[in-house]
Regions:
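Conserved N-terminal phosphate-binding loop of PLP-dependent enzymes in the Aspartate aminotransferase
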Residues: 2-486
């Protein structure tokens, strides 16, 4: 995208910040207030021993701290802020909806045109491959709703249905609520809560060529082996007992941007449909444009029966996620009880819909996904160019503006670092501190759900070529600094 196009997409005379690293001319490179300023808070933070930078405002890719630093947001938070921070069009849309006097409506009582317009925008974005949208407040809520909807689909058809089992994958993450966590295959996240998790969720291996490909095994043979494994799991459980198979097309937080190989999604869907089960995609993190198509499945045109969406849906301007529902699922409920036995207070709020609708309109009207593909390819190219030969970089993978780097103690054996070293967390902590001042998303459990380290880079969709070069230059400096001092 040209600078003018970027400015227009931001809704104001925004000019992408020039990251003047080489000559040290930027104020954030020349010091500023003392870091580590103690923060007094009664918030029960997720990390009780950390003193986080206090952010006071944001603009584009920049976050401004209370102590005078400027932090470049190279991860869009958790791959959320897809249009960057402070977008005038989106904030104005939210303001207008608030000013209407109806930021909230009880979704069980009333309809709303803003909500309807958003749902139409989303269904059109699937090429009408999906039929309806169920809106929620978070990705975890969306997965909870998906599990219940999938079960109700079969219950409506036959109240004595034996379909009670889900199949998901090892090394997956589908959310933090008990149902969503039960669907996940990330051992470390599950461990404290195992006694409470659904017992009827069964796992097959992930699709991770870096760690699972056999010697001389082609992509086609690899996919065939994975298909055989899923088929075997259906047979083990009894095909008539399986509700569905749930998969992330590109695994985000749990594995660090590991994409399914070409043909994998179709092979998995074919098995599900052969046995009358539902094919379910979790695109909360990898979807809504993050990988260069609005939905990750569109790159191979493998539409699901149910799909979760979130994060980039509202771009961080409101908490919103949802479930895209195929016509066959809609038909069963429509011709049955006529209702979905589920609901939460803050779902489908007009103010949430206003934010998401404006985000999606900007993406469509300004062909923003062209920039995702162009800058994403450049980001991947530069990462591989500068880090592929590093002795402790095992793999660099990703698509669009969604890239992961996996770290290893030994490149040949692919042995992970000792978990006590907290490699990914060290990289994050170093990156976000002066003089680097950039976010890098840390992840652990990359190898087996317990050990292994990776980081992710997922900048906003409006980044420039110069931004990408700055991201890679900074990431390389941080990684080299941390790894050489372990």
């Amino acid at each position: 995208m040209s600078p003018a196009a970027i400015a227009e997409a931001h809704g104001d005379p925004y000019v992408a910040a020039i990251r003047a690293v080489s000559n040290g001319s930027s104020s954030y490179m020349n010091g500023g207030a003392v870091q580590g300023m103690k923060r007094t808070t009664f918030l029960f933070d997720r990390h009780l021993h950390k003193d986080f930078p206090v952010i006071v405002r944001g603009s584009g890719s920049n976050l401004y701290t209370k102590d005078g630093r400027v932090i470049f947001d190279a991860t869009s938070g958790a791959a959320v802020s897809c249009l960057g921070h402070g977008n005038k069009r989106v904030t104005n849309a939210v303001y207008q909806q608030m000013a209407s006097g109806i930021p909230y409506l009880a979704s069980g009582f009333f309809g709303n045109e803003t909500v309807d317009d958003l749902c139409e925008e989303l269904i059109n974005g699937t090429g009408r491959k999906m039929a309806r949208v169920y809106l929620t407040g978070s990705g975890s809520e969306a997965m909870e709703a998906t599990c219940k909807l999938a079960r109700q689909y079969f219950y409506e058809k036959d109240k004595s249905t034996p379909r009670v089992n889900f199949i998901t994958r090892e090394g997956s993450y589908h959310g933090n609520t008990l149902g969503a966590l039960g669907m996940s295959g990330h051992k470390a996240r599950r461990a404290p809560y195992t006694p409470f998790l659904m017992p009827n969720v069964h796992h097959v291996s992930s699709c991770n060529p870096y760690r699972q490909r056999l010697p001389n095994e082609s992509d086609a043979l690899f996919v065939s082996r994975k298909a055989a494994e899923l088929e075997a799991k259906f047979q083990e459980l009894g095909p008539e007992t399986v509700i569905g198979f749930c998969v992330e097309p590109i695994v985000g937080a749990a594995l660090g941007c590991v994409a399914a190989l070409p043909g994998y999604l179709k092979a998995m869907r074919d098995i599900c449909h052969r046995h009358g089960a539902l094919f379910i995609l979790d695109e909360v993190m990898c979807g809504m444009g993050r990988t260069g198509t609005l939905h990750a499945w569109q790159s191979e045109n493998v539409a699901p029966d149910l799909q979760t969406i979130g994060k980039g849906l509202g771009g961080g301007y409101q908490p919103i996620a949802g479930v895209l529902i195929s016509q066959k699922v809609v038909n069963v409920l429509y011709n049955g009880t006529g209702q979905f036995i589920h609901g939460q207070t803050y779902q489908g709020m007009p103010v949430q819909a206003a934010a998401a609708l404006e985000v999606q309109r900007i993406i469509r009207q300004h062909n923003v996904l062209d920039n995702v593909r162009i800058q994403g390819a450049y980001l991947g190219k530069l990462l591989k160019q500068h880090l592929a030969d590093h002795p402790h970089v095992g793999d660099i993978r990703g698509k669009g503006l969604f890239w992961g780097i996996e770290f290893v103690k030994d490149k040949k054996s692919k042995m992970a670092f000792d978990t006590k070293l907290s490699v990914a967390q060290r990289i994050h902590d170093t990156a976000i501190s002066h003089p680097y001042n950039m976010t890098m998303y840390p992840g652990t459990g990359t190898v087996d759900g317990m050990c292994g380290d990776h980081i992710m880079l997922s900048p906003n969709y409006l980044v420039t070529k110069e931004d990408v070069e700055y991201i890679v230059r900074t990431a390389v400096d941080v990684i080299e600094s941390v790894l050489e001092n372990l």
